[in-house]
Amino acid sequence: MSLGFLNLTKLSIGANEIMSTRCPELKSIRKVSDRHLRARLAGLACALFLASLTIHSQNISWPQFRGPDSNPVGTHARLAERWSKTENVEWAQEIPGRGWSSPIVTGGKIYVTTATTEGKSKPPQIGTEYSNEYVAELQKQGLSMDKILERLTERDIELPKEVKLHYALYCLNLKSGKVEWQKEFFTGQPPGGRHRKNSFTSESPVTDGKFIYVYVANLGLWAYDLKGKQVWSTPLEANPIYLDFGTGSSPALIGNLLIIVNDNEKQQYLAAFDKQTGKQVWRTNRDIGEKGQRRSGWATPFVWRHALRTEVVTVGPSEAISYDLGGRELWRMSGMSATTIPMPFAYDGLLYIDGGRGSSMFAVRPGAAGDISLGKDESSNKYVVWSQPRAGTYLPTPVAYEGGVYTLTETGILARFDAKTGKLTYKTRIDPAATAFTTSPWAYNGKLFCLSEEGQTFVIAAGETFKLLHINELDEMAQATPAIVGERLLVRTETKLYSIRNKK
């Protein structure tokens, strides 16, 4: 900022010299003009200073799932590229219970949710192939599909009647990792079951810098101030989720509105709540997905701000739909899979939609209206800039970085597409050891980071050629997407929260 101020000072001096040399007749009013010019320049300097503070505050804040703009890219040059359980670990704090929600950060404090269980709980299971192999084994035994589902439920699903939970919000000091306070916001049976890979607190909280907003789908919304005082709570109706897989769509904030999307087997809706009171402002029912098929969704809504307007983009079973801030539909697009988990996001003027496993990846330009679905033989149209068939992923949300969009499958296949054209630049398995991923990849300092469920982070050079640089080990299951705050990387594993910071 000091350099900018010096430049402004030079500009002021230069203006005085011009006035003296070329406009001698203005000497009589020179002092007045000089004062006005200096005042305007001082005002500009102040504005630039405030802007720099805003940028700085963004660097030390991570207000929601996947960060300020929902595309997790760090900007600090000192962010660590290597770590282990001991190397470049500033601190590691145990978090009781289990939760795959991401940590959020504001005002030098970290906020994270968790749920502890009275009695035994089914442990998480790494990967997805164990279910596929089990189903294949049961099919060989000649079991009917109903019997197979019954066996799967018995093995993999934790039902509400089996557990009593204590849901809690934790506040930790960013610098030390010390727990400053914890608040239990609900005790009792959950509204639905969960798959053993999921948790009962997979929705990440969100903050506006003044309050922390906690959401558990089909259970409720809660608001806390930064000191841990509950400001309001709003109970929500319980609705069934497909096969009791559990929930995971995080809330979004825009202005005074706290927005949630809830696609379940009974009803599907988008709703906005007054963030100051918790009262519902509007609710829009969504009738998406094929009749008689699965109706549940897990994708977090995305607030897309662009030059034409601000809109709320949602992805659900079979369709992506965008709404204005009053809940009115703006446009929709078919072609999504029946199981939708990745979150939409924007990069360099375009919206990117991952349609889910087996579906396409889409790039959409601003200003869309009506049904913008692609025709049978189309790969683009007036609003869809490009699409890539079968480029959609199951669990991780893609990341856009340095001109590329990177997609990561749950089995460890990484692909890079040109962000503007959609051209595939490479597609490869990261490593023979990289076989299970839920966490979304992130990027900084010319590198891409992919955290596996086994706790290994594969560090890859960004660019058009794939190059695995090294592997960082934490040796504990991980499914939560990290937070990037200044020069710190916050990584949540099954039992701990790590602050990774370069010590060199």
Residue ranges of model-derived segments:
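Prokaryotic Sec-type signal peptides and long signal-anchor helices
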Residues: 4-12, 53-57, 421
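Bacterial N-terminal signal peptides
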Residues: 42-54
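N-terminal hydrophobic alpha-helix used for membrane targeting or insertion
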Residues: 5-6, 45-47, 162
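Generic hydrophobic-segment detector
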Residues: 32-37, 47, 167, 268
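Noncatalytic, solvent-exposed loop/strand surfaces
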Residues: 55-504
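N-terminal secretory signal peptides that target proteins for export/translocation
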Residues: 1-39
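N-terminal export/targeting leaders of redox proteins
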Residues: 18-20, 45, 57
